[in-house]
């Protein structure tokens, strides 16, 4: 309602502002300054309204939290009920419609020891039946629950120890199997390595034989090549000697021919002289 009145007042005030042409004095009334101030004032009003709403919302939220805190002590969680609670349960079932308890179906479901149940206690309950006995029974239930929890923890620890022991045995068996597999793998690796070494040795011997054959063939080819070179050198030397001889013979023949030509020329000249003398 407060918010409604506040909004109504704001709307009426906005109507008044829209009806006025401007406010101020002197130079502030000139031009569009009145509209600018109206806008600024509207922004301020909006901020104030938001602050008021946020404060109102937080106060409502705090009131809601206080109500929850008032109701929460009246809610209790139970883990199990035994057959010794028949009196307390009968009283609770008789006062189910008056004291605001849960229905019989929910209570029957809650009697299972493995399921927790929630009892909503009303603030205006007038019939208080054997609260002390119920508290004692609830304390006993809590102690039994703690003992059961300790027993379950001990059993879980023993189970964990057994599981760890079985796990260690399985790990040891796995390690033995892995060791045996590793030994077998090592044996297989050794056998394969031996076969590979033998194969490589055979291949090496074969390659050595082939290299020896190639070396011998290369040596024989080199010897043949050397013999051919020697033969060619000898032939070359013979040819050179023959060419020298032919050249010398040709030179001697040329000299002889020149001498013969000169002698013939001298004889012709002599014959010409003799003929001239005879004609005279």
UniProtKB/Swiss-Prot annotation:
What main location does UniProt list? membrane
Pfam family, any one: Zein-binding
Q: Where in the cell is it found?
A: Membrane
Does the keyword Transmembrane belong to this entry? yes
Mark the transmembrane ranges.
22-42
Which keywords label this protein? Membrane, Transmembrane, Transmembrane helix
Residue stretches making up the GTD-binding domain:
188-280
Record-level GO cellular component terms: membrane
**Compositionally biased residues, Acidic residues:** 169-187
Question: Per its record, what are the GO molecular function terms?
Answer: myosin XI tail binding
Membrane topology annotation: Single-pass membrane protein
Please give the InterPro entries that the UniProt record associates with this protein. GTD-bd
User: Disordered: where is this region?
Assistant: 153-187
PANTHER family xrefs:
BNAANNG28530D PROTEIN, PROTEIN FLOURY 1-LIKE
Task: Tell me the protein's name.
Answer: Protein FLOURY 1-like
Organism equals Arabidopsis thaliana (Mouse-ear cress)
């Amino acid at each position: 309602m407060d918010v409604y009145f506040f909004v109504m007042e704001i709307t009426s005030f906005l109507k008044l502002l829209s009806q006025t042409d401007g406010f101020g004095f002197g130079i502030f009334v000139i031009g569009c300054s009145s509209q600018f101030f109206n806008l600024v004032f509207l922004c301020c009003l909006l901020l104030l309204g938001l602050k008021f709403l946020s404060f109102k919302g937080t106060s409502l939220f705090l009131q809601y939290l206080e109500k929850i805190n008032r109701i929460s002590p009246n809610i209790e969680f139970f883990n199990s009920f035994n057959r010794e609670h028949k009196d307390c349960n009968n009283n609770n079932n008789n006062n189910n419609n008056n004291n605001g308890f849960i229905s019989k179906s929910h209570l029957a479901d809650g009697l299972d020891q493995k399921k927790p149940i929630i009892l909503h206690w009303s603030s205006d309950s007038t019939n208080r039946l054997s609260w002390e006995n119920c508290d004692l029974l609830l304390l006993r239930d809590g102690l039994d629950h703690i003992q059961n929890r300790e027993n379950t923890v001990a059993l879980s620890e023993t189970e964990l120890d057994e599981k760890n022991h079985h796990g260690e045995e399985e790990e040891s068996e796995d390690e033995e199997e892995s060791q045996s597999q590793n030994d077998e793998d090592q044996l297989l690796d050794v056998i394969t390595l031996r076969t590979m070494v033998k194969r490589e040795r055979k291949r090496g011997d074969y390659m050595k034989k082939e290299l020896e054959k190639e070396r011998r063939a290369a040596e024989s080819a080199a010897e043949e090549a050397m013999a051919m070179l020697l033969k060619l050198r000898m032939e070359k030397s013979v040819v050179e000697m023959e060419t020298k001889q032919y050249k010398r013979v040709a030179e001697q023949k040329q000299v002889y021919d020149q001498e013969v030509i000169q002698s013939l020329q001298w004889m012709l000249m002599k014959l010409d002289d003799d003929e001239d003398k005879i004609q005279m």
